[in-house]
Amino acid sequence: HAELLEQVKEDLKKEGIDLKIVIFNDYVQPNMGLKDKSLDANFFQHVPYMDDFGKKNGFEMSAVGNIHIEPMAAYSKKIKSLNELKDGAEVLLPNDPTNLGRALIMLDKAGFIKLKDNTKLDSTVQDIVQNTKKIKFTTLAADQIAPRLGEVDAAVINANYAIDTGLTTADAILIESKDSPYANIVTVLKGNEADPKVAKLVKALQSEKIKKFIEEKYKGSVIPAF
């Protein structure tokens, strides 16, 4: 995300906007920064996560622009395809409600497990109604999964953490479909949707220049969503 913002920093300067980029290593502080008004906008989440976070923390946010999708994927150091998973194998999944549901829906759509309802975005391991291989699903914080990939049979990893550890979708044994509702968005506190600074930021991020940058740099690990 920061890389994309760096790409538009100079363009925004010409528009009279001094873009200050603040990098966080978790999924909580960027939203709390909107709430306490220390940030004008953030760029890290998708709508299901934003809605869930707002509900739990008692404030509303708005999505003001889709920028890209980071397809979630399953990886393994031990097998080359999901079908090779042995009975009772251990698979790591992210533990926050949105990404856990997202991971389970991906596994359901691949025919690997069956969920009670594969449109329910906040499905949990308890919603699995068919697990023929008796896979042991362990849930962990999203940022802790990639470092532990070697200890388990397979793991579902968010693209940003996969990229950080040098994994690409070419290494994946399963990739989420491109029509996922999980595009990364620019987010503001509800009521600030008309902020002209933010409108210019979104316009810069949805430019042809950024589209090209995403396609050339990430080669499918990240895809434009505009």
Describe the function of each predicted region.
Residues D52-V64, K78-I79, E151, V156, ...:
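Ligand-binding "clamshell"
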Residues I21-M32, T119-P147:
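Short helix-initiation/N-cap motifs at beta->coil->alpha
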Residues H1-K20:
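Short, polar/charged alpha-helical segment
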Residues P71-L82, A183-D195:
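A bilobed periplasmic-binding-protein/Venus flytrap-type ligand-binding module shared by bacterial periplasmic
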Residues K35-Q45, A89, F112, K133-K136, ...:
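Alpha-to-beta junction loops
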Residues Y27-G58, K80, A162-G166:
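Pocket-flanking alpha-helical
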